Amino acid sequence: MLIRYKKNLEKIAMGLLSFMPDEKKDVKKLQQTIKEYETNDNWHLHLWKEEDDVRGAIGVRIEDELHVIIQHVSVNPSHRNTGIGRTMVNEVKRLYQNKYAVSTTDEIEDFYHKCAEVEDTTIDADD
């Protein structure tokens, strides 16, 4: 289930974001990123929780009145290749698509398009 980030999950969120290439375990950069999610109303961090375990993080930035950009997608290494990343991307698209055009940073663009391809294949299979 996708939940909004809360301050009491800061260490878990920082750990997940540290797997992003731009963050790469740079503690000061991670702290700045988390602070931005906590203080900037246009930055939204969501966590993926199953049972009592946070397994992933996805962060978006509202660029303007029409665009939201997915800028962070990270899954705990022990839960990778289980569909969590794809599920988070698709959930965020569902959350924001009625109000914004959803896109990504260059860093995660390929992953985003793979998620869309898998979703399209699933929809076609259901027809």
Region roles according to the model:
Residues 29-35:
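Short, basic/aromatic recognition patches
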Residues 47, 53-62, 69, 74:
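Conserved beta-strand in the GNAT
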Residues 75, 81-94:
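Conserved acetyl-CoA-binding loop-helix of GNAT-fold acetyltransferases
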Residues 5, 74-77:
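Structured beta->alpha junctions
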Residues 35-47:
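A short helix-loop-beta-strand connector motif used in the catalytic cores of GNAT acetyltransferases and
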Residues 1-29, 126:
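Short amphipathic alpha-helix that is part of the acyltransferase structural core
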Residues 96-110, 117-122:
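Conserved GNAT acetyl-CoA-binding A-motif
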